[in-house]
A protein has these predicted regions:
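Extreme N-terminal, non-catalytic leader segments
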Residues: 1-43, 87
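NTP-binding/hydrolysis catalytic cores, primarily Walker-type P-loop NTPases
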Residues: 1-3, 229-232, 238-255
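Helical mechanochemical/support elements of P-loop NTPase systems and associated helical scaffolds
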Residues: 29-32, 51, 55, 73-74, ...
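Residue-level signature of catalytic and energy-coupling elements of molecular machines
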Residues: 33, 44, 78, 107, ...
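Walker A/P-loop phosphate-binding motif and the immediately C-terminal alpha-helix
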Residues: 35-73, 197
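Phosphate-binding loop that captures ATP/GTP phosphates
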Residues: 65-67, 71-119, 225
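Switch II (G3) loop of P-loop NTPases
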Residues: 110-169
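Conserved catalytic-core segment of NTP-binding enzymes
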Residues: 146-238, 244
């Protein structure tokens, strides 16, 4: 990955050529991936990564080849949810994803960071708001274009809150991915997720459905049904506070 000074030096960067080459590499790496699904919410605290990891495991238990890309670069949680006790730690030189629980392949910035260490890029602090986004987008391109994903039936993209990462991935992939939306029942979650779903639809993503998480507890509301009616899609799963493997198997059967 290039540094800030390499990106900003006009004689050395070749940024346009680099991005073009990476896009070509992404297309080549993902040529054997049958389906790409972005798991998103537009809101934090809804259990999106938890849903992504358990959905991936259920799909893998059903005999499918599954990969997960943890697109939450600043708050990666997928390694903690999928890491097998015997899994190796990723290295900068490796081009293979880690193999996690139930054989799910995954890649995450969390594999490269020391425990508790924040993500940081080298560059001038005073200008970080200008170049940090470009560096994060470059990291995503490398995760997709440099990792040997192999033959996958489904690649799940675990997105952070907000829409910036979704937009970056649309640009990197060339086509908008199918979207699976996660919400909790509350009106506040509904309103935040609505904005994310509307943006995804406007960008051209197919809506796979809505997962309503943390159902049946203290959280009250009808966010799942409200959003399903508004966007003419389905609530494909209602996840209770203590789901069983059958809960995830039923969700996986709908993909």
């Amino acid at each position: 990955m290039r540094t800030y000074h390499q990106l900003t030096d006009p004689d050395r960067s070749g940024l346009g050529d680099q991005i073009g080459a990476q896009r070509k590499r992404v297309a080549e790496r993902l040529a054997a991936v049958r389906r790409i699904v972005a798991v998103m919410s537009g809101k934090g605290g809804v259990g999106k990564s938890y849903v992504t990891a358990h959905l991936a495991r259920a799909l893998a238990r059903g005999g499918r080849s599954i990969g997960v890309l943890d697109a939450d670069l600043n708050g990666p949680t997928i390694p903690g949810l999928l890491r097998d006790s015997d899994a190796r730690r990723a290295t900068q030189e490796s081009s293979e994803p880690a193999s996690g629980l139930d054989g799910v392949k995954y890649i995450s910035m969390g594999q490269f960071l020391e425990e508790g260490s924040p993500l940081s890029f080298k560059g001038p602090t005073a200008e970080s708001f200008v170049w940090r986004g470009a560096m994060e987008a470059a990291a995503l391109r490398e995760f997709l274009g440099d990792v040997e994903w192999g033959d996958l039936e489904v690649l799940l993209l675990d997105l952070p809150p907000g829409m910036q990462r979704y937009i970056e991935l649309c640009d990197i992939l060339g086509n908008p991915p199918t979207v699976l939306t996660v919400t909790i029942p509350t009106p506040e979650s509904r309103d935040a997720v609505r904005r994310a779903m509307r943006a995804a639809v406007e960008r051209g993503s197919e809506l796979l459905g809505i997962v309503e998480n943390m159902v049946g507890g203290e959280l009250k509301g009808t966010a799942g049904d409200d959003l399903a009616a508004e966007f003419a899609t389905a609530v494909v799963a209602r996840i209770p506070s203590h789901p069983t493997p059958d809960t995830w198997n039923r969700l996986a059967a709908q993909l």
